[in-house]
Amino acid sequence: ICTLILWVGKYATLDRIVKWVILTLTITTIIAVVLVSIKNTTPLSFIQVFPAETNLLFLIAFMGWMPAPMDISIWHSLWTIEKNKELGAEVTMKESLFDFNVGYWVTLILGACFMGLGVFVMFGTGTEFSSQGGVFASQLINLYTSTLGTGVYLLIAVAALTTMFSTTITTLDASPRAMSKTIELLYPKRKRNDYKLWLLILAGGTISIFVFLLSEMGLLIRIATVLSFITAPFYAFLNFKLVRSDQMPKKDKPGKGLQILSVLGLLFLTSFAVGYLLIL
């Protein structure tokens, strides 16, 4: 369905659909967090515990996509270019930054909400969660309904559906755009847009994973998030280099304060990635 929407509707349809999906996701998720926090009777512990070696992989995987992968900046840039084509006018830097910041903060807030749901509903239940996607989804919804009652089944189902749909359709659009742009930059003489070709490749690969590796979805997610975490310093360096290069208009370049913060962030990401690789 997502592939068909992107194939026929292109960016304009994606933009319209995602806005409503994210709005629905945000409302249902926040309501779920409020309800489950009201029902919770277990006191929360705020003692910081350094993860044992066995849990370090989970922490790294968690950081890899929290609140979003580092290459989200590439996705947003490509979507801005596409929006310029759709509108027939150039989106200003102020508008682009506002759009990015809103999306990033919403992602961050939703990430915190999902953490809260995990703490209130999943943590300490003793349930051994399945690595199979369908079984895990069933376990998750059953936990929520047993905690909040069957009346919230539809609310949780809508939140889960919009989460998966928004993630699928945005990734399914952004990755082919990134690959198509990469080929264009590597081979400037090529005039053909390979977006639809990469869309088919990604869709076909995704379906193949579902068919042959459905029982190992947990492992696949860990691999993807860990790789995202390890490659984060590379993307961060490229971003930092680009915004300081001559390709960025002088008036739009970051100030000294933001550049210092960027260097500190780059050192943080690099230190964590190198440290993780050393203890493997």
Task: Give the residues covered by each predicted segment.
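Hydrophobic alpha-helical segments and their helix-loop junctions in multi-pass secondary transporters
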Residues: W7, L23-F50, L59-L78, A236-M248, ...
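Membrane-helix boundary/coupling elements in multi-pass transport proteins
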Residues: F114, Y153-I183
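C-terminal membrane-solvent junction of multi-pass transporters and transport-like membrane proteins
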Residues: I17-W20, Y187, K191-W198, R222-L277
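Selective recognition of specific alpha-helical transmembrane segments in multi-pass small-molecule
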Residues: E95-F123
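Membrane-interface loop-to-helix entry segments
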Residues: I1, I5-I38, F50-E53, R222-A232, ...
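Helix-loop junctions at the membrane interface of multi-pass solute transporters
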Residues: M63-L97, F120, K181, K241-L242
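Loop-to-transmembrane helix boundary motifs in multi-pass membrane proteins
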Residues: V106, I183-L214
